[in-house]
């Protein structure tokens, strides 16, 4: 048992040495440029020199913005004229017409219960239009059953 383990360890070490040799950079390849560290006590040298760095909002700034939004929400409940959300709500609740994007009601909801019972007994359905009633066949086709 110990012999098997020692053979496996030797194989792993052999593979590792081959891998290390393979991954070593050759003398012909150029490596990354060396990093130059300049130590200084100046405050300006401690600032990042990247122009792409964007300062993040601090936690107190975020809390202040949240508090301001809460205050404006409270003002809207007091003065509904100034609140845009309230005016939009009134616009849709006062207008009796449905928006054009709304799906129309299905006809089975508009048909009275008495007519529906009659359709179930006879098995024939009629649809009313301006000309009168038009037979459509069985109620199964309309989905009334």
Swiss-Prot record:
UniProt-annotated stretches for the region Disordered: 1-58
Biased composition (Basic and acidic residues): 1-27
Biased composition (Polar residues): 38-52
Family: Belongs to the BCOR family.
Name of the molecule in the record: Putative BCoR-like protein 2
Organism of derivation: Homo sapiens
Gene: BCORP1
């Amino acid at each position: 048992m110990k012999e098997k383990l020692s053979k496996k360890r030797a194989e792993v070490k052999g593979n590792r040495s081959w891998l290390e040799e393979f991954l070593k950079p050759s003398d012909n390849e150029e490596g990354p440029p060396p990093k130059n560290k300049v130590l200084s006590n100046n405050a300006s040298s401690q600032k990042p020199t990247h122009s792409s760095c964007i300062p993040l909002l601090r936690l107190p700034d975020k809390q202040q913005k949240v508090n301001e939004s809460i205050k404006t929400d409270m003002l809207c409940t007091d003065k509904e004229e100034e609140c845009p959300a309230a005016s939009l709500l009134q616009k849709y609740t006062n207008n009796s017409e449905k928006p054009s994007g709304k799906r129309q009601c299905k006809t089975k909801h508009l048909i009275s219960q008495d007519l529906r019972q009659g359709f179930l007994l006879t098995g024939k359905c009629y649809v009313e239009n301006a000309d009168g009633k038009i037979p459509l066949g069985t109620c199964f086709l309309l989905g009334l059953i």
